[in-house]
Amino acid sequence: MPRGTAQRGGLLAHLDRPKSRSRLRVREPRRLPRGLDRAETAALLGSFRSDRDRAIAGLMLFSGLRSAEVLALQVRDVDIPRRWVRVVGKGDKERTVPLDVDVAGLVQTYLLAERPESASTALFLVAKGSHRGQPLTPAGLRTVFRYHRAVAGVPAGHPHALRHSFGTALAEAGVDLAVLQALMGHDRVDSSAAYIHLAPTHVRASYDAARARQRADV
């Protein structure tokens, strides 16, 4: 047997076999969240008529709450005088977030004048109909936003769009990534970092500031 043939049967045998495809999976780029622009936000917020719905939208837009987090709020979770909200997020993880002063006023007015009398301790209740006084459900919240998207002419006006607008606004304001992660309730820092990509003006400002410091050190 020729020497070359013997070698191919041993160390070089792989040259005669078709290469199998690599089983490594390439991670697909993370889809960046879509927030609302100023006009869309104003139109959507302007369509709400009840203090309950305004407060719900405000908690999403100015405190970054998810739909499920809003619906899980209990009356005791909202500290209006100190303007804090206790939030139970994914995996039953708790965080405390600031309460915008205007949203605090909406919640207070809702509690005093609009919230139905009920044995339920849930913050947001059904306002009318046969389920009046019962906790607002995910289906009920979807109905509210579906109606107001149509009224406002803002097809992208979903609850998560308000939350994403909150995250984007923080990134544009230059909020520290760790603070952004804490406010948004993200388990992974890369989830928060996605908002930095949505704020190119902040990225450019940070870059220019860093370059200015470098030039000053030369």
Where are these regions (language model features)?
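Conserved catalytic core of the tyrosine transesterase superfamily
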Residues: 1-218
